[in-house]
Amino acid sequence: MDYVKGIFKNRPNRFIAEVEVDGKIEIAHVPNTGRCKELLVDGAAVYLKPSDNPKRKTRFTLHFVVNKGELVSLYSQEANSIVYDAILDGKIKELQGYSYHQREKQVDDSRIDIYLANQEDDCCGMEFLVDSCYIEVKGVTLIVDGEARFPDAPTERGAKHLKELIKLKNDGNRAVVFFLIQHPAGNDFRPNWENDPKFSQTLVEAENAGVEILVYKCNNTLEGIELVPKSLDYDLSRK
């Protein structure tokens, strides 16, 4: 389905936006609960996908916004799919070599975004999994002077995910937090100490505990989104 171009006007709450389409104000679902205040500014060009579902409260979903001449993806949940597909395609060198791949692995009372492992057979021919790797994906849209930062608003949930990864690592598993920069202008990554010192400090603690940090970016076009197969640098220090 083709995208519909519009002009962003207002965001009454986290979930909806008022967008002008062909001279008429339409209500669009915003699939990103972050503030995105540096992106969603009055007059910004946006791209929407219409829905054929008559039961939906909103006719459109906001997928992209144009910022600094670049197409930025606002579909935060799409980050998980982009990373998962890139793993299957062998585009992430740090995550190659696994024979078992799973989305949304249940761990205690939480779900980890991606689970990788290797399949082996026991002496009776029964399959079992070894080399477990748990991956939590975070989509990043905030850019400050070419530097991607996460989160753009305080996130208790994000800090909780990091603590879960620390526990998994301490239990002998491989654990990874994967930051996918969804804004093409981002060239490296730093946690947002100014907006969320708790998450930022927990990220430092996670790295010290052995949780791996991977940073990649993606190319956005209206024809599709693809991960750029090259890891980027990060700096966890408080500036």
Swiss-Prot record:
One of its GO terms (molecular function) is DNA binding. InterPro entries: SfsA, SfsA_C, SfsA_N. Gene3D superfamilies: 2.40.50.580, 3.40.1350.60. Pfam families: SfsA, SfsA_N. Belongs to the SfsA family. PANTHER family: SUGAR FERMENTATION STIMULATION PROTEIN A. HAMAP family: SfsA. This is Sugar fermentation stimulation protein homolog.
